[in-house]
Amino acid sequence: MMQYLVVSLALCATICSAAQTRNMPIQAIAYLIGPVQSDNTQVKGNVTFTQNDCGQNVHVRVQLEGLKEGKHGFHIHEKGDLTNGCISMGAHYNPDKVDHGGPDHEVRHVGDLGNLEANSTGIIDVTYTDQVITLTGKLGIIGRGVVVHELEDDLGLGNHTDSKKTGNAGGRIACGVIGIK
């Protein structure tokens, strides 16, 4: 297990060094897809992550379709495993073992990216910046899973027992693995 960690860290350092040498941003992408629903809709699309320099903020572009109108929890999960669908991705990426929170909260999982809001036609096309995630290094997200949830994330502020663990965001309706672009 330790060998895999060392190899992963070395790979991330190499990617970061190569990108800086060429003065290019590091990019990663995840193609998300969910099961076909009873109304014949299917959540699908992609999430692109761009980091201009190692250690700087990550720009996130989300383009999805097939959602129900409203807010949906959006998280990085600890594993990039699709063996048993989205459930194989494990819990939210939380290396610091802290409570769930919102993207602008001081205390949050690394993977807590808040909510995405689908319009009346079920489309999300949004770009924003996250100050906690990184593509490389100790907290790098490359190779991890990204998940869109059925319900709105309560950002750890709700009274439900799942609030401090998952934001009570409900089931996983689409997921993908983050890979280097």
UniProtKB/Swiss-Prot annotation:
Cited InterPro entries: SOD-like_Cu/Zn_dom_sf, SOD_Cu/Zn_/chaperone, SOD_Cu/Zn_BS, SOD_Cu_Zn_dom
Residues the record marks as carrying a glycan: N46, N119, N159
SUPFAM superfamilies: Cu,Zn superoxide dismutase-like
UniProt cofactor(s): Cu cation; Zn(2+)
Pfam family, one: Sod_Cu
Catalytic activity: 2 superoxide + 2 H(+) = H2O2 + O2
Signal peptide (UniProt feature, chain positions): 1-18
Protein family: Belongs to the Cu-Zn superoxide dismutase family.
Entry protein name: Extracellular superoxide dismutase [Cu-Zn]
Species annotation: Drosophila melanogaster (Fruit fly)
Lineage: Eukaryota, Metazoa, Ecdysozoa, Arthropoda, Hexapoda
